[in-house]
């Protein structure tokens, strides 16, 4: 019983000392040797607790939290927020910047827009003249142009840059247009015969083709090369004469020769001469008509000799005159 009373007395003294000093760390530093309990009394008071730990339920109270220690930090945060709000209010309240040219949009200062340069007719004329002579002027040339037309060198440099871009665009379009025109001309040149036929009338082409056919048949029958392939014998328009020559008794072949009269030959060549009325062509045609007359005379002599030698075996002829 005495031991329990001593233990309670020691605990009561500890509570009193704890209530006197709110901070236990400070109270330990401020306690003097008189206020400390003797070691033998503490050991004697804690001895029963080791034997019976459930003798009483005691919990050491925690030190109270000091709210005042957090107040300065909160005050600083509130001051920072208030300063930011004041800055934003100042930014939004000023519609123009320091230069007085730009405006703010959502707190961001926009770059002032550069005004366009309006050139006069005199300036444009001088610039075009310089551009026709030199498309890439150097610094000294640009400065000279700027002084001459009362402009700044950067404005002249920008004008030449834009003018070169415009010139390149026009050149590109011009090359494309010329390429399309070249393809059209090439497509037309792929058919030269059709273009020639279109240049001449159809009646002239038909008459020339018929004359060529007539001359081919006439030459074959003129030199005695008639055959079975010739279905219809050729008959001249004037003075038709047919000869039946029997060369061999055992084999009889019928050759039809049509000697051409001078009038017929002259009429043929006169038709061709009318198609191309040139002095040199007429002289050539008259010469050919004379040679054709000589050939006709030779053929008449040959026909007379052949008609006199009918019924005799065939002998080759010897030609001595000019053909």
From Swiss-Prot:
The record's listing under SMART domains reads: HOX
Q: Which InterPro entries match?
A: HD, Homeobox_CS, Homeobox_Pitx/unc30, Homeodomain-like_sf
Composition bias, kind Low complexity: at what positions? Answer: 91-102
- Which residues fall under the DNA-binding region feature? 112-171
* Gene Ontology CC annotations of this record: nucleus
Q: Which GO terms describe its molecular function?
A: DNA-binding transcription factor activity, RNA polymerase II-specific; RNA polymerase II cis-regulatory region sequence-specific DNA binding; sequence-specific DNA binding
Region annotation (Disordered) ranges: 83-119
The UniProt entry's GO biological process terms, in alphabetical order, are: anatomical structure morphogenesis; axon guidance; dorsal/ventral axon guidance; GABAergic neuron differentiation; positive regulation of transcription by RNA polymerase II; regulation of locomotion; regulation of transcription by RNA polymerase II
Q: What is its main location?
A: nucleus
Q: Where is the composition biased (Basic residues)?
A: 110-119
Tell me the null mutant phenotype. Aberrant synaptic connectivity of dorsal and ventral D-type motor neurons onto ventral and dorsal muscle.
Q: Where in the cell is it found?
A: Nucleus
Q: What is this protein's tissue specificity according to the annotation?
A: Expressed in D-type GABAergic motor neurons at high levels in young larvae, in which the motor circuitry is formed, and at low levels in older animals. Also present in six non-GABAergic motor neurons and is absent from the seven non-D-type GABAergic neurons. Expressed in DD GABAergic motor neurons and VD GABAergic motor neurons.
- What UniProt keywords are attached to this protein's entry? Developmental protein, DNA-binding, Homeobox, Nucleus, Transcription, Transcription regulation
Q: What does this protein do?
A: Transcriptional regulator within D-type neurons that controls terminal differentiation. Required for the development and function of the 19 inhibitory GABAergic (gamma-aminobutyric-acid-secreting) D-type motor neurons, which control locomotion. Plays a role in regulating synapse formation in dorsal D (DD) and ventral D (VD) GABAergic motor neurons, possibly in part by regulating the expression of the neural regulator oig-1. Also required for expression of flp-13 in DD motor neurons.
Similarity annotation: Belongs to the paired homeobox family. Bicoid subfamily.
Q: What is this protein called?
A: Homeobox protein unc-30
Upper taxonomic lineage: Eukaryota, Metazoa, Ecdysozoa, Nematoda, Chromadorea
């Amino acid at each position: 019983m005495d031991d329990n009373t001593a233990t309670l007395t020691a605990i009561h003294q500890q509570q009193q000392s704890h209530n006197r000093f709110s901070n236990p760390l400070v109270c330990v530093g401020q306690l003097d040797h008189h206020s400390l309990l003797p070691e033998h009394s503490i050991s004697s008071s804690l001895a029963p607790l080791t034997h019976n730990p459930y003798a009483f339920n005691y919990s050491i109270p925690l030190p109270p939290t000091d709210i005042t220690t957090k107040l300065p930090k909160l005050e600083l945060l509130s001051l920072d927020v208030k300063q930011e709000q004041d800055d934003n209010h100042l930014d939004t309240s000023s519609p123009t910047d320091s230069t007085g040219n730009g405006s703010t949009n959502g707190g961001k200062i926009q770059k002032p827009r550069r005004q366009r340069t309006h050139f006069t007719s005199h300036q444009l004329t001088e610039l075009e003249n310089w551009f026709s002579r030199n498309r890439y002027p150097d610094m000294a040339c640009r400065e000279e142009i700027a002084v001459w037309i009362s402009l700044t060198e950067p404005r002249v440099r920008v004008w030449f840059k834009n003018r070169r871009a415009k010139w390149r665009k026009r050149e590109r379009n011009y090359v494309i247009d010329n390429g399309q025109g070249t393809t059209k001309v090439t497509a037309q040149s792929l058919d030269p015969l059709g273009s020639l036929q279109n240049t001449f009338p159809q009646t002239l082409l038909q008459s020339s083709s018929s004359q060529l056919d007539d001359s081919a048949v006439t030459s074959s029958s003129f030199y005695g090369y008639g055959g079975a392939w010739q279905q219809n014998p050729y008959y001249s328009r004037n003075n038709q004469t047919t000869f039946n020559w029997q060369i061999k008794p055992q084999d009889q072949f019928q050759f039809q020769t049509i000697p051409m009269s001078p009038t017929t030959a002259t009429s043929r060549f006169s038709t061709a001469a009318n198609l191309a009325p040139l002095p040199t062509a007429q002289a050539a045609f008259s010469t050919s008509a004379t040679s054709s007359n000589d050939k006709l005379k030779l053929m008449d002599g040959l026909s007379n000799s052949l008609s006199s030698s009918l019924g005799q075996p065939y002998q080759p002829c010897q030609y001595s005159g000019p053909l």
